[in-house]
Amino acid sequence: AASDVYKRQVSHKGLDLVQAVMDDLMQEDIQLVIIGTGEQNYENMFRSYADQYPEKMSANIVFDNKLAHETYAGGDLVLMPSKMEPCGLTQLIAMRYGTVPIIRETGGLYDTVPALNPETMEGRGFTFKSYNAHDMLDAVRRAAAFYQDSKHWKLLQKNDMKFDSSWNQSVQEYWQIYRSML
């Protein structure tokens, strides 16, 4: 499974969690694509790991919207371990492409990416609650294991691609609440 991290490379995006388990991530059967700019220590870390593991990781320390969309289109997973995320667009864009989110349950990420229940196929991605590197690593491992079941993986991708995050759905929900109050 390929996972990508596309965001501003700053600590509140959870990159300290990624940093804490980078050696473990490099041992998993995944490839990482990093796109974005930010704090120098994270940029340097990603470059260093990309140099050490060129077959496992690509560090693109640039802001390149076209490359980001190409990565969403070609990726399998997007990792968003944010400490806080009031809204979040990355997961919505990723799902539109069929790229499954791995998120920490916070803010807008929690609102838009309910945890997948593999038995019922309800949910839209893989989640972890605690702001903890090993919980994040566990979510990555669960996602990579689920990826091996191609039939269910494709179903999850299709469900994510159909998710309606437009205002149409919100307007309907507000309208129902308004009508119930009359």
Where do the PLM segments sit?
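Residue-level signal for the nucleotide or nucleotide-sugar donor/cofactor binding architecture
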Residues: K13, Y131, S165
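Catalytic binding pocket for nucleotide-activated donors in carbohydrate/polymer assembly enzymes
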Residues: N65, E70-Q157, M161-K162
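A conserved mid-protein helix/loop that constitutes part of the nucleotide-sugar donor-binding site
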Residues: V10-D23
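Short, small-residue-biased leader/transition segments that mark boundaries at the very start
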Residues: A1-Y6
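Nucleotide-activated donor-binding/catalytic signature segment of Leloir-type glycosyltransferases, i.e.
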Residues: D29-A68
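C-terminal alpha-helical cap of glycosyltransferases
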Residues: W167-L182
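Short donor-sugar binding/catalytic loops of nucleotide-sugar-dependent glycosyltransferases
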Residues: R8-V10, G38
